[in-house]
Each structure stands twice: as C-alpha cells, then as structure tokens.
Amino acid sequence: MPGVAKRKYVGETMRINKNLSQVLRRLSDVLPYNYNAETLLELFQQLYPHEWRELNQRFDQYKEKDEFLLKKGKKIRYKPNPPKEHFFKLPIVKNILSKGRIAKHNANFDELAYQERFAKFKAKRENAIRSRNEKIAKANELIQNVEPLFIDTFIAAYHKRGISFDEKMEIFKELQKYKSKKTAEFFYKLSESERNNQIRNMAFKHLQVTGNYVKLRKNFNGKKKEYMTESSEFFMTPLDLLKRIESNNVQNKKVYDVFISHSYKDSSVIKKIIKAFNKLSISIYCDWTSDSDFLKRELVSEYTKVVLKKRIEQSKNIVFVKTDNSLESHWVRFELDYSRELGKTLFCINLSDEAEGECNVLQFDVKNETISWTTGLVK
C-alpha cells in the first residue's frame, strides 16, 4: 500500500510533538525575564537532555533512511527537519516566542518568585535526569563499547537461510554484549522488520533501556507462520557451549584481543579495566560477561575448563589482573598455566603488594579508567 510508511512517520511525529508541547507548557512557567529563542532552547536542552537527544537520534535515523532510498534510485520519503528546526516549528514554541507572550511575561515578572519557582523546578528535573541516567548506566554496565572482531560473521550467520530460532537467539544475545555502529544498526533493523515477535520485542527493549530512540512496532497482522510465534528462554550450560565451539557454530568463529585472567571477587575493578581497554578499541574476553548465557557459576564443571581453554586459544593476548583474590584462585592458576603452555605473551596489571614477576606490566589508572603499556599488544 503506497504511502503507509510515510503516514506512520507523520503519525509518529504528531505524537512526539504532542509530548513536547506538554513539556514546553511546564517549561514556560520557569522562563526568565525578557527570554528569547536562544534562552528557550538552551533551557530545554539543559532540563530535558534526553528528549533533545532523542530528537537528534530520530533525525539521524530518518535522514539515513532517505539517503538509502536516494542511493537506490528512489525518491526520498521522510524529509525530517533538523532538531533545531523541528523545535522552533512547534506551534507552542511559536506562541511562547511571540512578542505579545513575551511582553505579558515581562509585565507580570516577579524576580523573587521566579528564583524560587525555578530552583524547585530545576531540582525536580535534575532528580529525574539523574534517575534516568542511572538506569541507562546500569543497562550499559556490562556492555563493551567496542566493535567485536567477529561481528560481520555473526550478522551474516543471523541472516543465513535455514538458521534455527535458537541459533538466532544465540547470535542476538552475543551481539547484545557490544555497543558499536554495526550492532546498533543490527538491532534497529530487527526492531523494525524482524518477523519473530520475541526477537523484535527484545531488540526494541535492548535499544530503549540502553538509551536509544526507538519505536515499538506492532505485531504483524494476518495468518502467522510458525517462526513468527516461536519463543525460547535460551537456558544454556557449559556443555551446550562446548558442543557449539566444537561444531562449526558461530562460537567457533570468535576472536578476542585480550583474555582477562582474574578473580570474580574483583568484579568492580574488572569492569573499569574492560572500559579502559575499550577506549583503545580493544575487545575483551571476560567469562562472566562474554559467556554469561553459558558459564553460570552454579553450573561449573569440567566442561567449564575446556571452554576456558578454547577462549584462551581464541584470544590474542592474556592479561593477568594480579590481586590478593586472584593470587588465591585455582582458576586463575589454571588459566595462566595453559596460557604459558600455548606460548601466549603474558601481561600483568598489578593491584597487589607483590612484585610483578615475569610478565609485561600494564599501567592502569583506576580514577581515569585508562591503560598504557610499554610493550605492544598483539592486534
């Protein structure tokens, strides 16, 4: 049906404008004396940063869609307005910035009452912003901000004809652990056009909780094929992972820049170390994040050791995080012994009182979450 996509876009724009109008009505109660267009926009950006960011993200999305259509020799469809233009075209903004409205505001302006009203409003908004920021940070806590080395292989495998539903779920959950341009594009495509209800809704939720603008699509109408209604809890064990690694599964295609050998008791500092490596575009293998769907602590077995051996083999470098906890861990000893057996170069981040020993020392700045080294990592 011609025009359906454009009508959906227009309807979505109307709903967004309605929400923005409600926000701006509240904001109009705390405008300063003799405000202007610049004042209004700056105040909106300051007190409603997430709404402003979503306007920017939405513009970028639909601009890319138009560019894609143009590239394919088709007419552009959406013609989205840049965020500033969108903002100032809102009827309520035009009303707030009208000469009559500003004159009336100035005539009734009370500086003391304004200061008190603005302070309360700002405090309320800061609490709301802080709360949302904390939720987004929590959702992103274990996600690596780096493009995985195997992403193209995984995305190609997802779209391969004949792939099972569980295999699609596996790839989804793997790419969910990374934040990059390609993973974002992958999840946006799933949220818009994936025909399985569970996966499409999972893609929507993942994008939403991690702080991205996304629209929930309705379930497809009409007669549904079996695949569209399939679902899975994807409960897996170390043995399931081992079987996948030993077969020609996507798990066998993984490559990591660094395997972190550490104690799980040091999880708080390990999260910071991972972020520091990610700043340098270095991908990390950390068992309780990278294989969280398979290596559950309550299911530890001999299969876990075999899996860890394979992950060490798939990693280009080994980084030992030396702490009092890791020095007492038999798992860490096992990982280091196997790494030496393979002839892997061993790096060390020493957070203990002991000497570094025979390894290449990496300097880790806990406060700034940065890592530097004098010897090169294999890339």
From Swiss-Prot:
Pfam families: ThsB_TIR (PF08937). The keyword Cell membrane does not apply. The keyword Hydrolase applies. Activated upon phage infection. One of its GO terms (molecular function) is hydrolase activity. One of its GO terms (cellular component) is cytoplasm. The active site is at residue 335. Its EC number is 3.2.2.-. InterPro entries: ThsB__TIR-like_domain (IPR015032), TIR_dom (IPR000157), Toll_tir_struct_dom_sf (IPR035897). GO terms for biological process: defense response to virus; signal transduction. Homodimer. One of 2 TIR-like protein components of the Thoeris antiviral defense system, composed of ThsA, TIR1 (thsB1) and TIR2 (thsB2). Phage infection activates this protein; by 70 minutes post-infection with phage SPO1, TIR2 generates a signal molecule that in turn activates the NAD(+) hydrolase activity of ThsA (tested with B.cereus). The signal is similar to cyclic ADP-D-ribose, but how it differs is unknown. Expression of Thoeris in B.subtilis (strain BEST7003) confers resistance to phages phi29, phi3T, SPBeta, SBSphi11, SBSphi13, SBSphiJ, SPO1 and SPR but not SBSphiC. This is Putative cyclic ADP-D-ribose synthase TIR2. The gene is thsB2.
